[in-house]
Structure formats: structure tokens, C-alpha cells
Amino acid sequence: MNEKNVYNAIADVYERFSDSAPQIEVEIRTVFGLAGEIQGKSVLDLACGYGLFSRLYKSRGASKVVGADISTNMIEIARNKSRQYGDGIEFHVRDVCNMESLGKFDIINASWLFCNAISLEELEMMFRTVANNLAPSGKLIAYTIEPDYQLTKGNCSNYLCDILSEEHCRGGLLFKAEFTFPSRNPPLPPAPFTMYSWSREQHAEASHKAGLQIEWHKPMLSQSDIDNQPAGFWDTYQNNCHEAAFVCKFL
């Protein structure tokens, strides 16, 4: 598994995870709750994958949407869908750590980008790329692993994400995990991936070096989410959540 491109090998099944995982709706609600008004805005979707958020921004009225991802397989899927829907979204294969400016965007979306920084240097590089592509009054909406999450306090198996191990690595934490598909018929084998967790202080320092200030937010779990699942289903998500969001603007 390529350390920097873990999703290339599982691109064909990742959409099935997104279609099945109950917390995806929470993620979508959180991202757009923080994004605010979309109509007429330009959007850059970093770590866009197969284009889920790119298309959601476009359907909510964004005037221009550009997606970028390191995975050639993900971008191929995204482009095929864009041709199918005729939505005019641009998709590019890019390593965000070494990406040129594609313009100045009102909103930069980064769902599950920063947890792919394999070092503090890469974390800083990602924030610099954001700063180089963000309009002066724009904002970054990011979704990533919760810095306070601890495997010893509960796994995420209810949410189709089985975390196998947690270890110290390069000043942060490395989580080895699998997407699972227990309800698929015929069943699919687990899809392995990794995440790197950096502290709030490390995020703050890296973003500040790029001229950005950071504000953390919890996922917007609703009462209807709770009511639609068996009792206790969301307990780990509420008490030891593995997900978090943050917003960045220029200082």
C-alpha cells in the first residue's frame, strides 16, 4: 500500500462505503452547516475522491467547482461521473502537498485530506496550498480525524470503519484501519487504509505558518440520526468520536 496514496487501491469500493456508512450524512450536514451560503461561490475540493462533495457543492449552486486528488483511480471515477451528469466540474490529479495555485476560491473543501499528512512537514505544506488557493475573504472547511480520539476508549465498527491499531509515529499517531461492508451481498473484503492524527496544537501551528487561523467544530449529529438507529448505536460516536471538523480563514 502506497503510504501517500492509500485510496488508489480501494477507489472502486470507497463509494460503497460512502453510500452505506451512517455517519456520512452527519459529515455532509456538518460541512455545509459550516460552509454557509454556496450560491454563486467558487469551490476547490481537495482530496475530492470520486467527487461526492464536488457534486454536492455544484448542486447547491456553486458557480465553479474544481476537484483535486492524488489518486488517479479516484479522479477517473470522478471524471466519468462528471461526463455522465454533464455538471462541468473540473477534476485534476494532484498531490496537494506540491500543488500549484488553481485560482483563488471562495471555499476550499478538504474532507479527509489532513489525516493523510504523513509528517508535520506535509501538514504545513497542505496548509500552504490552501493559503495559495484561497480568496482573501474565503474559508477552508475541513473534516478529519478527531485529535482526541483514542482507540482504547472505543472502536468505530458501528460506522463501518474498523480501527486495527494505534501507534506513535513522527510526532503524531498512526492509525491502521479498514472500511468494512458487513451488509453487502455478496460480501466484500475489508478495504485497508491509514490515517495520521495530529494534535490541535500542531494543526494550529501549521495553519498559522500559512497565515491562517483555525477553529474546531464537532460533527453535527442530529436527534433524528439518533432516533433512526438502535439504542446505544451512537454512544462511541458521541463519547469518543473519531471525526472532527475545522474552519480556517486568513489571519
Provide a role label for each language-model segment:
Residues 124-136:
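A short glycine-rich, Lys/Arg-flanked "PGG" loop and its adjoining helix->strand segment in the class I
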Residues 1-38, 52, 56:
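Conserved class I S-adenosyl-L-methionine
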Residues 141-206:
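SAM-dependent methyltransferase
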Residues 109:
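A conserved beta-strand element that flanks and buttresses the S-adenosyl-L-methionine
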Residues 44-46, 50-98:
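Class I SAM-dependent methyltransferase SAM/SAH-binding core
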Residues 202, 206-251:
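C-terminal lobe and adjacent flexible extensions of AdoMet/dcAdoMet transferase-like proteins
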Residues 112-115:
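Short catalytic micro-motifs in class I SAM-dependent methyltransferases
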